Each structure stands twice: as structure tokens, then as C-alpha cells.
Swiss-Prot record:
It holds the Pfam family RNase_HII. This is Ribonuclease HII. It comes from the Bacteria. Residues 71-259 form the RNase H type-2 domain. Endonuclease that specifically degrades the RNA of RNA-DNA hybrids.
Length: 261
């Protein structure tokens, strides 16, 4: 074969099967560079196949429900139960039956760049999206568990059309009789995974904004979780207006600084 390695690389990017005549022709090329390209191409196909299989697995709950006659299936998830500062955010997402974007998974398992890209894709292709945001002061009043349920209900209430079935990550909500709570649902249901991405990106962007407003806690990186830098900020600066007073490290910092007044 007279093609250069770079030309072969470009052509292989268009090939989708080992049965392709060009791929079979490359298999006769004894150059080490070509052999490496073929191996890289095979690995790429294998990864793509795994992603497609994962997509089909994650659509199984929705597929079964569509076959039962349900039309608008909402997935619900939350982010921000554990942080010491900021709101808890929930999202509810209704996806079309033919939604087939590969790569969607539990938002915590995705890179920030991948989450951001999928966030835009979901916003564009979803039938409906709702986002519930419950602030720190309400969390302190009702506790984080109840605040999380409030956020989920708020997200569901925003959906138009209304869902006729709800899939929820872990937490039983009793929003409707047609409801199923799934342990680790964000790794089992495409709708819940989509909701987890919407919720996380929304909350992360809020915390990045708060980092500019309340510097010294590293909110842009820790998103309000109790990291070393965050705890150092509490020790040296004290609390800020978005801290959750009912959470032990924040309560201790407040008591300490109040005692110095």
C-alpha cells in the first residue's frame, strides 16, 4: 500500500467494520505504524460497542414502560445532599422514546467537559425538563432529607406535559402512584442519568458563581463539600451566607466565631 500513515489514519476514521475492503487491505500492510492504527481502530470500535450496549441496558426500564402504554416517563435525581454550603438541586427529565445518545451515565462518573456537552444535548432533545432548587436556609429548617424531596417535587411540578410515570433514584417520593424507586438508578435508567447530569451541571455552575461572591472556601472546586480548603476557610474566615448552619462543621465554626465577639 502506497498511502502514508497519516492518510491511512484519516481513511480508517471512516471505516466501521473489519469487513470493510480498506480495512482488509490495511491488514496486508506490514508496517508497524499501520498495525498500531488497526489495533487503535479495533479498540475504538470495542469502546463504541460497549457504549451502545450500555445505552440499551439503561433504556430497559423506559422501554418496558413504553410497551405498557406509558408515554411521558420522568427520571428524577438530585445532587448536593452532602455539602456544607449551597442548595440541594433536583432535576426531572422526560426523554423521547427514540433518545439514543451514547455516553450518558451517572453524572459523577463523567468528566466536566462530557457533562457539559451532554447537558446541552439533553436540553435540546428532552421533551421536558424541570429543576428544583432548595436553598440552605430551608435545608436548615426541614433537614436535608425533606429538602431533597421538596427539590424533587418542585422539579416534577415544572414538567409540561405532566409525567404519567416517574423513575426516581433511590428515594421513595410518593409523587404519584405510577412511580418506581431504583437503587443506583442513575446507572440503570437513562432518564434518571439525564436528570443527574442536569442537576449536577446546574448546581456546579451555581457554586462557581458563589465562589466569586464568597471567596476563601474554594467553592468553584469543592462545590461546597467539606474539603481541606473549605474547612480551612471555615476556620479562618468563619461562615458565609450560604452555609448550612445545621451541619456539624458549620455549626462548630459559627459557635467559635460567635464566642470571639
Amino acid at each position: 500500500m502506497s498511502d502514508s500513515i497519516s492518510v491511512i489514519r484519516e481513511k480508517l476514521n471512516q471505516v466501521t467494520s473489519e469487513h470493510d475492503p480498506f480495512f482488509r487491505k490495511c491488514m496486508q500492510d506490514e508496517r508497524k505504524g499501520v498495525e498500531k492504527l488497526l489495533e487503535t481502530t479495533r479498540r475504538k470500535w470495542e469502546k463504541e460497542a460497549q457504549l451502545r450496549n450500555k445505552l440499551e441496558e439503561m433504556k430497559q426500564y423506559e422501554t418496558d414502560l413504553f410497551q405498557q402504554g406509558y408515554k411521558y416517563i420522568a427520571g428524577v435525581d438530585e445532587v448536593g445532599r452532602g455539602p456544607l454550603a449551597g442548595p440541594v438541586v433536583a432535576a426531572a427529565v422526560i426523554l423521547p422514546a427514540d433518545f439514543s445518545v451514547v455516553g450518558i451515565n451517572d453524572s459523577k462518573q463523567l468528566s466536566e467537559a462530557k457533562r457539559d456537552a451532554l447537558f446541552e444535548t439533553i436540553k435540546k432533545e428532552a421533551i421536558a425538563i424541570g429543576v428544583g432548587i432548595i436553598e440552605h436556609d430551608v435545608i436548615d429548617q426541614v433537614n436535608i432529607y425533606e429538602a431533597t424531596k421538596l427539590a424533587m417535587r418542585e422539579a416534577l411540578d415544572q414538567l409540561t406535559p405532566e409525567p404519567d410515570f416517574v423513575l426516581i433514584d433511590a428515594m421513595p417520593l410518593r409523587y404519584t402512584e405510577a412511580e418506581l424507586s431504583l437503587i443506583k438508578g442513575d446507572t440503570k435508567s437513562i432518564s434518571i442519568a439525564a436528570a443527574s447530569i442536569i442537576a449536577k451541571v446546574t448546581r456546579d455552575r451555581l457554586m462557581q458563581m458563589y465562589d466569586e461572591k464568597y471567596p476563601g472556601y474554594d467553592f468553584a472546586n469543592n462545590m461546597g463539600y467539606g474539603t481541606k480548603k473549605h474547612l480551612l476557610g471555615l476556620d479562618t474566615i468563619g461562615i458565609c451566607p450560604i452555609h448550612r448552619i445545621s451541619f456539624a462543621p458549620v455549626k462548630e465554626a459559627k459557635l467559635h466565631f460567635d464566642s470571639l465577639k
